[in-house]
């Protein structure tokens, strides 16, 4: 599958403030290495998204993430979610979806921390998602969500603890393809080890 696979899809990638990103890796990685890791994974996710989708947007409050997104050719949306918001990630995703919906009839939320996701996997997931109004790919643990797809305009992101079950309960169809790279998000030292086993060249 080539770039034509999903040119009517808009991809949303959300990135936290880099100062607080990937805090669970702090015991094994100091802050400068965590920042390099986050930016490297973001750049990889953008490249994979562009391989199969027509529009890629990064939403973040962080100026360094903005620079990385712009350099990679992605649209940047400033995340103006107020401090103390009870659901900041999903609020940011809803904001980005509202801005992309006019130009992209189909939407995808792709996690920013997927260092071994491949263009082939992403294109296959997009193709599978076309058969459903709303669908998702669970992470390798089966509890989180690596990607959320909408082909009817109603994204309804429910990321957070047990997001896979929350998306199932909300009616989203679980896509069950053999996509180990797409399912391998990195939050913990164990995740880093698995990503390396799958061939990730991590920028540490």
From Swiss-Prot:
Its EC number is 2.7.7.105. One of its GO terms (biological process) is F420-0 metabolic process. Coiled coil: none annotated. It is an enzyme of class 2 (transferase). The keyword Transferase applies. Phosphoenolpyruvate binds at residues 145, 160, 163. One of its GO terms (molecular function) is phospholactate guanylyltransferase activity. Keywords: GTP-binding, Nucleotide-binding, Nucleotidyltransferase, Transferase. InterPro entries: CofC, Nucleotide-diphossugar_trans. The keyword Nucleotidyltransferase applies. It catalyses: phosphoenolpyruvate + GTP + H(+) = enolpyruvoyl-2-diphospho-5'-guanosine + diphosphate. Pathway: Cofactor biosynthesis; coenzyme F420 biosynthesis. Guanylyltransferase that catalyzes the activation of phosphoenolpyruvate (PEP) as enolpyruvoyl-2-diphospho-5'-guanosine, via the condensation of PEP with GTP. It is involved in the biosynthesis of coenzyme F420, a hydride carrier cofactor. Belongs to the CofC family. NCBIfam families: F420_cofC. This is Phosphoenolpyruvate guanylyltransferase. It comes from Mycobacteroides abscessus (strain ATCC 19977 / DSM 44196 / CCUG 20993 / CIP 104536 / JCM 13569 / NCTC 13031 / TMC 1543 / L948) (Mycobacterium abscessus).
């Amino acid at each position: 599958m080539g770039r034509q696979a999903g040119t009517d899809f808009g991809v949303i990638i959300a990135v936290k403030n880099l100062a607080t990103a990937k805090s669970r890796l702090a015991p094994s990685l100091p802050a400068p290495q965590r920042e390099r890791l986050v930016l490297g994974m973001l750049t990889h996710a953008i490249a994979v998204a562009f391989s199969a989708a027509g529009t890629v947007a990064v939403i973040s409050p962080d100026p360094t993430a903005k620079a990385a997104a712009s350099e990679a050719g992605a649209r940047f949306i400033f995340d103006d979610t107020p401090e103390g918001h009870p659901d900041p990630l999903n609020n940011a995703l809803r904001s980005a979806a509202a801005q992309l919906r006019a130009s992209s009839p189909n939407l995808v939320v792709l996690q920013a921390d997927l260092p071994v996701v491949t263009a082939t996997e992403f294109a296959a997931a997009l193709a599978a998602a076309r058969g459903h109004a709303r669908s998702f790919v669970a992470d390798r643990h089966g509890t989180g969500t690596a990607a959320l797809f909408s082909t009817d305009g109603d994204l309804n992101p429910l990321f957070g603890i047990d997001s896979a079950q929350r998306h199932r309960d909300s009616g989203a169809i679980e896509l069950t393809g053999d996509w180990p790279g797409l399912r391998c998000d990195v939050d913990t030292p164990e995740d880093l080890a698995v990503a390396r086993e799958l061939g990730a060249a991590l920028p540490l």
